[in-house]
């Protein structure tokens, strides 16, 4: 059926061929060809009521969307635009972009924050005010967050956001309304999110049942066929977050390092107490205490089972004050800082006060100490991701920065009033080399919707629960032309996963989370492939054998067909001669995959999916007594 989808895409492009490629407002911008393509297809089909912009961070999803909103009047005169976004993203990028390039539509825009606890009430209140003569265009930014808030809880209770989800799913397709969903990571935590977002875009075409059997999609072909044209797919980095990616004229090179640091004896003691406390309290699966202890350990671990929350808060506050008082007004000597900046450590001839201070700081946090040393040795600006803010998180990290004489700004929930200005100062061209502000430390609040320029090193101090969040974090620094002002020899980003290690060799919470991420990624990769091959770009490029059409009367029927996941696609089993191999996409072998190489040089993964042909002169390395091909 993809040929039929291609015919409708071609019809839309012809219908909108006179659409300008420039967007004029108080400023002027020329769209990239891929942005213009999306706009022409979406606006060229009146009955194409929804689309997912599955675009990498930094390729211009916001610009594409604002261009579409600007030209809604080309197909109908009266529109109400509902922008459902996180509060942190209203001003920048949305308000700023609209006011710069399409100020005339601002009077038609209603912003509603879906991270507001009263979101659903505000949504339905605004819906009631919309004139019956007006069509509605909904923009759902970072739609994976909205989907996550719409999932039914494990106890079976429906979240308030689900009522908004149900309304959009039912009503957007009526009266030629439109909806644009934006995300660089449309599936984050669970494969159920795939079904949720598909049914939001194409109501009720997938039933809530398992799409996988033994971690393999039951019917990939059926999904691709029925979901044709559901999204626009612009993903330049299809590699795992743990793999290296070569740079290009527009994007910086990415190099990944698994950087292991050994806990001190004191930190190990607190870490083991945290582990026991998790087991006793029944929250071991969340690993909160261990994650905090692996990052920073106070001199004692509060017994949280015998105390109230207020008592625990007071005790942690006292421990924090004790630590601050201890290091207050302490800092390393100029000679020590010079050594650290040159990438060297202290020696026996160094100032005893410097040696003692470094030892004390490392006793409490092997991670914070190591990151500070690497920041000072970095030639450019740095980002540090730390999800925790109070107790053992950003609050303490900033104390370490002070001792190491590191200048920084913070982007987190506690800096809401200043964080946009902080990032603006950090991104200034005059600060390209980090001479005024060396580091921006950010929590999960900084994982979406903001951009950083001329970053050379990213340090991830604590893992998220999924690869998608990690991609969002790294994607803040590797964006289209993000390193344009950086000297050519520094157009790279080193990504360091800082992993705490126990002397016993027992896996730590950091290593546990990495394994969880890798397990989830296998299923997500297959679903992303479905999005790719059902995208308007893939169809138009690969499906040339179609009959031109003169109207769009059949589009709604074509895109309303129900997916039958119970019918398994036929698999052709073929025998091939060859050998089992190990391969990696990274020369540092961050992730190693098991595969099969045929006698004629074709490489397949363990599920029989073709990867690529073996290079003529392959690079082979040895890792844990395995011969590993670097491809």
Swiss-Prot record:
| PROSITE patterns in the cross-refs | HELICASE_ATP_BIND_1 (PS51192), HELICASE_CTER (PS51194)
**Main localisation:** virion
Give its E.C. classification number: 3.6.1.15
- What does the entry list as the binding residues for ATP? 55-62
The sequence motif named DEXH box is recorded at 141-144
Q: Which GO terms describe its biological process?
A: DNA-templated transcription
Stored SMART domains: DEXDc, HELICc
What does the UniProt record say this protein does? Answer: DNA-dependent ATPase required for providing the needed energy to achieve the termination of early transcripts. Acts in concert with the RAP94 subunit of the virion RNA polymerase and the capping enzyme/VTF to catalyze release of UUUUUNU-containing nascent RNA from the elongation complex. NPH-I must bind ssDNA in order to exhibit ATPase activity.
Q: What is this protein called?
A: Nucleoside triphosphatase I
Report the source organism. Yaba monkey tumor virus (strain VR587) (YMTV)
Q: Recite the lineage of the species.
A: Viruses, Varidnaviria, Bamfordvirae, Nucleocytoviricota, Pokkesviricetes
Name the gene: NPH1
